[in-house]
């Protein structure tokens, strides 16, 4: 398993619980140091996902699998629901279309007399704790989790693959899964696969202490556009408020900085949804880099030049949301490739799930400082 983000951790857990020998390679010193650790932490239910798309199928599948896993992990979850409030006739028409879309997807929503769309299933978690918890359960079930293990090369060798890491280790495996996020296209090129390209779409967020006497009971979603879901305002599991993200395309995969002007860009939209933010100053900020595909989305399947490498790439902005569904889908691909997973077993009793010392938004801000 190449990449220790939330998708890689979810696939590793799914394999380990089915008795498959699996090693997770993470280039960084800790898991979820990329896109998986710098996002909203919102667990979407797929009410707005388009029909007949793989992304939609896997979001819906993940939503069905999610609650027992969250309960087992014991990570913090705020099951607060979400609301979208249209501001004009055009937005009201869009919200009505979202309601019809949710009905087609089988997602529970309600359209109020005021035209607002209520989505009770939306929730917020700590995405870093979630990722690390999935990996901890995988390790307890027999998986090996290697940190500081940056992949340098993949060598096809008959019916095997040899993976070489930066510290000189060579790992012999029958199959490899490329879940390297922003570096997914670079990993694919190790086997001559240039069928997709990944670029970073930066999303900047700002964290606030709630003003005295104010409360935020639900996730506030804007009416989406064709390009982005827009700026949200949401409560965190530790009682803060967050506004964001932006959607800024760039080429640098290592630039995690918050741009000058991003605060004004976010707050002009956030204050319209939540006037209590007027005059509020952030206590922290952070930027995440979504692994966006150039003209593609949810590239999941065997690599054409090297079918023993399974690509799981261009999971732009729904990795936390869809991770369990993606893992379930990849299990099917691996079975087709000759892996024979057994029936899922319960993780060992008392399997340790780490409790991060700091909230995820603070750790995400440190990534910006390091960059």
Predicted segments with their positions:
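Short beta-strand to alpha-helix junction loop
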Residues: 50, 57-60, 85-94, 117-137, ...
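Helical element adjacent to the flavin cofactor pocket in flavoenzyme catalytic cores
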Residues: 121-175, 183
């Amino acid at each position: 398993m190449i990449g220790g983000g939330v998708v890689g951790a979810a696939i590793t857990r799914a394999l380990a619980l089915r008795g498959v020998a699996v090693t997770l390679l993470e280039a960084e010193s800790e898991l979820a140091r990329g896109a998986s650790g710098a996002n909203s932490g919102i667990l979407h239910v797929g009410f707005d996902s388009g029909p007949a798309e793989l992304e939609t199928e896997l979001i819906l599948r993940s939503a069905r699998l999610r609650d027992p896993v969250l309960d087992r992990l014991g990570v913090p979850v705020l099951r607060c629901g979400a609301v979208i409030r249209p501001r004009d006739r055009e937005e009201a028409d869009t919200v009505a279309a979202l309601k019809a879309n949710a009905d087609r997807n089988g997602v529970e929503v309600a359209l109020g007399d005021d035209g607002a769309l209520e989505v009770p299933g939306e929730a917020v978690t700590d995405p870093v704790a979630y990722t690390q918890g999935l990996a901890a359960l995988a390790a307890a079930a027999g998986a090996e989790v290697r940190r500081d293990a940056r992949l340098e090369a993949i060598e096809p060798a008959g019916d095997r693959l040899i993976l070489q890491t930066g510290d000189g280790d060579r790992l012999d495996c029958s199959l490899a899964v490329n879940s390297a996020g922003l570096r997914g296209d670079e990993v694919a090129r190790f086997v001559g696969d240039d069928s997709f390209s990944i670029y970073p779409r930066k999303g900047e967020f700002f964290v606030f202490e709630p003003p005295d006497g104010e409360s935020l009971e639900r996730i506030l979603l804007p009416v989406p556009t064709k390009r982005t879901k827009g700026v949200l305002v949401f409560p965190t599991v530790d009682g803060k408020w967050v506004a964001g993200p932006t959607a800024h395309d760039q080429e640098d995969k290592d630039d995690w900085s918050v741009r000058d002007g991003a605060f004004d860009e976010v707050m002009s939209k956030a204050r319209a949804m939540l006037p209590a933010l007027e005059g509020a100053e952030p206590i922290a900020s952070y930027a995440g880099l979504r692994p966006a595909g150039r003209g593609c989305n949810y590239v999941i399947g065997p690599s054409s030049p090297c079918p023993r490498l399974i690509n799981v790439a261009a999971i732009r902005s729904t990795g936390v949301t869809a991770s369990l569904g993606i893992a379930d889908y990849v299990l099917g691909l691996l079975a087709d490739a000759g892996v024979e997973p057994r029936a899922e077993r319960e993780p060992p009793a008392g399997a340790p799930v780490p409790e991060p010392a700091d909230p995820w938004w603070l750790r995400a801000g440190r990534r910006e400082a390091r960059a």
